[in-house]
């Protein structure tokens, strides 16, 4: 049987071509689209098909297909949903993962689409129930049980005391108040997630207008809200403890079974060890793991055989009374990680190249041979862009070389000169969006010794602890450095050999030649980078096979200096060579060599001519990020993937790993135990070792340790980020309870979203005014080697020291004190004119002298005076408390016994009177507003207002 998109049900035509969610309900055995406004609303008597399309970074689409079966749906409707899902998968390209979802036993992946929960309603299409925007029925008191740390399974239970227990979270929804009952054995994370359901119920069924109360199991009648809660159940009575039979009910050992679907029947396959070789490409198999069942469909199977295998899986579950089990269907070559993990050893999956014109590799060819329409299966492949560092490049850098148990601070002129046999520690402080940020890292040369590496880790950890874990920490290996490292150093040279005593001892013991770089000796450098703020000179073996047509090189021996330009290089590459010559051989002239026109002397220095590469050294591209919660128990690391993650998934009590293949981030919550916090780097290394996503991760992959409240932008870019959430104190449950009760979401001016990629620095600035720590002149000027440092000193006096140049554009900030008149243009142009005059004086063809002074124009001086007077006037304006809600300080604190009602808990200070505000903060409101947001939050925290 063959189909194409035009042969499938009209409701499926054109679907799966853009990122997002599409839902259909089965009505009279036909799929009917569900409007977007009703996504997440399910009826117990119906069956649904859900398609999640995800746009991947490699330019392709990933499709996940789910068919959801309500507990009261008919068997015919359930079968229709299963068959239609197989047909839709074939029409989409035959590589989607298909999930059978049963009410109450949904996969976490499905629940992640409909956050915070799915709350199925009684009835269905056969009963006349339709998807409507608002349920207009009278409110009925309902009791729900909530389970889950990362996503929440919600189930309605009878409104009786016997439904309650000590292990779970319960939500009692009454007409005027919502109660959350926290079982004494439930964990903080479950309680926090259940509060998201409380917020959903409040917004959906109460229009956001009702009280919320939290009841702790065991507090009895001492608490007013607890007394009110138990009164609804007819009074308090102790809850029974879970029996031992209930505790052990789910501990039955399941035996994994493999069955082959052959000519309409299932045949058991016996095995001692589950191996990949048991699966044949022209057959379908059922892998029964108890709680879930997998259907594996070989690429050589027909659509009819795949349908038959799907029906056989459904029938097997019915016959064995296992209707609640999940069924996951995978196609050969597109298996899930969980399916692969069931086997003793799974071979690397070949990288199927996908084409928007011809379909998806071999799978598309197979489908075309069966008459399937595979056009338009891919979006246009994106152009490769230089990765953005998302870090301010103008901060303060310090570098130490590790030598045994100690470290030596390098001078500013030597801190960018690293040796491959040594280990280094660097500390970089820079201005972040809300406060000063810090990155502490280690860099291990390829030939560094274990003794120095161990010492570097220990010394860096002490620095990290001394910073009270408020910095980010990095572990980097030579050859695997992230973009942030290069833009921090800007102009970097990596030399052969090493200077540490550990390295010297190592080569002495092993009888190895010491190839440590000598300025007057023979050396060859490969030049690479993307610009003046990101350029490196890497010393390589001084032989012709080290050359590459895609790069430029510097070769020197004594007073002889050559530059070699490959045929595939650009003008930028040539510019980088000139810049690196200023560092490596600043006082010697160089002789240029073009590829194919080299002199004999050049080849003689390299030991003769031989073949070399012309392909640029490949770099791994960042993959789509995956977030995992981590538990380290007795040196055993257990992880769980969080699907479609958001910032709210980062719980203060837990450690998470964000894996984007090129980098690994370990996020540590504020409430994590101190001992576990110190093992964050170990967790990252164990994650790389286990390679949970089977990505063939290198052990040298960069690892960043990120602490809650001090997240750098190169981490937050993976989220829709709200800094105020990470700056709140208390457990994840306490924070969410404050938000739910206060009715406000904490935020700063605006949440920080993923920063759009721009090349270079702020695009809105004139390039002639840009500068970096490593640049003593404008990149647009003609370069003259050996220029006197006097020019730099004088020119810098005219540049604005407060101007920041970011590797990515800074967030827009409103002016606190806008001027009504005047312009900044005269001030800027006058300073730039002076700098240009100095430039021409030093670089022009005629001899000039430096002016003794440069006067500021009257227009600029007037503008400065206007700005100063405007600020002064704003700060001295009297403050008016009229038309404002005012509460005394004692009722506004986070620890108040009588908290003020209906306030924005993220802006408690605005409810203080002007007099009390000045008394507590020691300044006026206007002065307070003029402070950076991070400083405001610190002052508020000190006063228990945050």
From Swiss-Prot:
Q: What is its main location?
A: cytoplasm
Molecular function (GO) terms for this protein are: actin filament binding
Disordered: annotated span: 744-783, 846-902
Q: What do the Gene Ontology cellular component annotations say?
A: actin filament bundle; cytoplasm
Q: Sorted alphabetically, which PROSITE patterns does this protein's record hold? A: HP
Provide the HP domain boundaries: 881-946
Any idea where this protein resides?
A: Cytoplasm, Cytoskeleton
Q: Where is the composition biased (Acidic residues)?
A: 874-883
Q: Where does this protein have compositionally biased stretches of type Polar residues?
A: 765-777
Question: Which BP terms from GO are recorded?
Answer: actin filament capping; actin filament organization; actin filament severing
Q: Would the keyword Nucleotide-binding be found if you checked this record's keyword annotation?
A: no
Keywords from UniProt, A to Z, are: Actin capping, Actin-binding, Calcium, Cytoplasm, Cytoskeleton, Repeat
What SMART domains does this protein's entry cite?
GEL, VHP
Record family assignment? Belongs to the villin/gelsolin family.
Q: What job does this protein perform?
A: Ca(2+)-regulated actin-binding protein. Binds actin microfilaments (MFs). Involved in actin filament bundling, severing and capping. Caps the barbed end of actin filaments and is able to sever them in a calcium-dependent manner.
What protein name does the entry list? Villin-4
């Amino acid at each position: 049987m063959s189909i194409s998109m035009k042969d499938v049900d009209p409701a499926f035509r054109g679907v799966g071509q853009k990122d997002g969610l599409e839902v259909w309900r089965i009505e009279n055995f036909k799929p009917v689209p569900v409007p977007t406004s009703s996504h997440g609303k399910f009826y117990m008597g119906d069956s649904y098909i859900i398609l999640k399309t995800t746009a991947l970074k490699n330019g392709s689409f990933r499709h996940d297909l789910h068919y959801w079966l309500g507990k009261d749906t008919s068997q015919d409707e359930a079968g229709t949903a299963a068959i239609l899902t197989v047909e839709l998968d074939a029409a989409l390209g035959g590589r989607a993962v298909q999930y059978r979802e049963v009410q109450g036993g949904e996969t976490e992946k499905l629940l992640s689409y409909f956050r915070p929960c799915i709350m199925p309603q009684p009835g269905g299409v056969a009963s006349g129930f339709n998807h409507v925007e608002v349920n207009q029925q009278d409110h009925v008191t309902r009791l729900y049980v909530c389970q889950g740390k990362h996503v929440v399974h919600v189930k309605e239970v009878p409104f009786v005391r016997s439904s309650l227990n000590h292990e779970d979270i319960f939500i009692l929804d009454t007409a005027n108040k919502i109660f959350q009952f926290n079982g004494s054995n439930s964990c903080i994370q479950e309680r926090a997630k259940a509060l998201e359901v409380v917020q959903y119920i409040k917004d959906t069924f109460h229009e956001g207008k009702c009280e919320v109360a939290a009841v702790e199991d065991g507090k009895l009648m001492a608490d007013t809200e607890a007394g009110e809660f138990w009164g609804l159940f007819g009074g308090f009575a102790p809850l029974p403890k879970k029996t031992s039979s209930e505790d052990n009910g789910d501990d039955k050992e399941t035996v994994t079974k493999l069955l082959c679907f052959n000519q309409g029947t299932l045949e058991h396959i016996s095995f001692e060890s589950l191996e990949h070789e048991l699966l044949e490409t022209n057959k379908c198999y059922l892998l029964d793991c108890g709680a879930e069942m997998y259907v594996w469909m070989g690429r050589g199977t027909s659509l009819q055989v795949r349908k038959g295998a799907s029906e056989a899986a459904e029938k097997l579950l019915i016959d064995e009374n296992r209707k609640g089990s999940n069924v996951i269907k995978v196609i050969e070559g597109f298996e899930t990680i969980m399916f692969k993990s069931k086997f003793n050893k799974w071979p690397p999956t070949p990288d199927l190249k996908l084409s928007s014109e011809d379909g998806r590799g071999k799978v598309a060819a197979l489908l075309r041979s069966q008459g399937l329409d595979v056009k338009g299966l891919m979006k246009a492949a994106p152009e490769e862009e230089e990765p953005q560092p998302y870090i301010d490049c103008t901060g303060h850098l310090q570098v130490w070389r590790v030598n045994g148990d100690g470290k030596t601070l390098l001078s500013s002129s030597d801190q960018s000169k690293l040796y491959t046999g040594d280990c280094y520690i660097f500390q970089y402080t820079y201005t972040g969006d809300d406060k000063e940020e810090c990155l502490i890292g280690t860099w291990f040369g390829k030939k560094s010794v274990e003794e120095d590496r161990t010492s570097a880790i220990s010394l860096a950890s002490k620095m990290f602890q001394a910073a009270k874990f408020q910095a980010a920490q990095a572990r980097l290996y030579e050859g695997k450095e992230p973009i942030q490292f290069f833009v921090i150093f800007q102009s970097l040279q990596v030399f052969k050999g090493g200077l540490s005593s550990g390295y010297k001892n190592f080569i002495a013991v092993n009888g190895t030649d010491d190839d440590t770089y000598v300025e007057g000796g023979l050396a060859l450098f490969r030049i690479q980078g993307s610009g003046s703020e990101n350029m490196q000179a890497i010393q390589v073996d001084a032989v012709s096979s080290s050359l590459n047509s895609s790069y430029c090189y510097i070769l020197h021996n004594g007073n002889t200096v050559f530059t070699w330009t490959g045929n595939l290089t650009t003008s930028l590459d040539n510019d980088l060579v000139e810049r690196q010559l200023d560092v490596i051989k600043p006082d010697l002239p160089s002789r240029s060599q073009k590829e194919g026109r080299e002199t004999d002397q050049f080849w003689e220095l390299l030991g003769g001519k031989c073949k070399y590469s012309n392909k640029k050294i490949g770099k791994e591209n960042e993959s789509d990020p995956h977030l995992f919660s981590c538990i380290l128990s007795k040196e055993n690391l257990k992880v769980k993937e969080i699907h479609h993650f958001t910032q709210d998934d980062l719980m203060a009590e837990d450690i998470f790993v964000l894996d984007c293949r090129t980098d690994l981030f370990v996020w540590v919550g504020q409430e994590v135990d101190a001992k576990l916090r110190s093992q964050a780097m170990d967790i990252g290394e164990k994650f790389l070792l286990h390679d949970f996503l089977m990505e063939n991760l290198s052990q040298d992959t960069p690892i960043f340790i990120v602490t809650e409240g001090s997240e750098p932008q190169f981490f937050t870019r993976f989220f829709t980020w709200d800094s105020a959430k990470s700056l709140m104190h208390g457990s994840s449950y306490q924070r969410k309870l404050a938000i739910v009760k206060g009715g406000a979401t904490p935020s700063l001016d605006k949440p920080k979203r993923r920063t759009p990629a721009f090349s270079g620095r702020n695009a809105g600035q004139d390039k002639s005014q840009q500068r970096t720590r490593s640049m003593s002149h404008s990149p647009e000027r003609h370069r003259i080697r050996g220029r006197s440092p006097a020019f730099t000193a004088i020119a810098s006096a005219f540049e604005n020291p407060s101007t920041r140049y970011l590797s990515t554009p800074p967030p827009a900030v409103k002016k606190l004190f806008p001027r009504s008149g005047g312009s900044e243009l005269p001030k800027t142009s006058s300073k730039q004119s002076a700098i240009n005059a100095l430039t021409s004086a030093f670089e022009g063809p005629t001899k000039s002298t430096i002016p003794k002074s440069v006067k500021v124009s009257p227009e600029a001086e007037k503008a400065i005076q206007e700005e100063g007077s405007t600020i002064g006037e704003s700060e001295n304006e009297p403050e008016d408390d009229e038309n404002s809600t005012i509460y005394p300080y004692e009722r506004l604190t986070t620890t108040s016994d009588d908290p003020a009602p209906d306030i924005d808990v993220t802006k408690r200070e605005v409810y203080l009177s002007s007099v009390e505000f000045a008394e507590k903060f020691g300044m006026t409101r206007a002065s307070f507003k003029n402070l950076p947001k991070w400083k405001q939050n610190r002052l508020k925290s000190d006063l228990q207002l945050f």
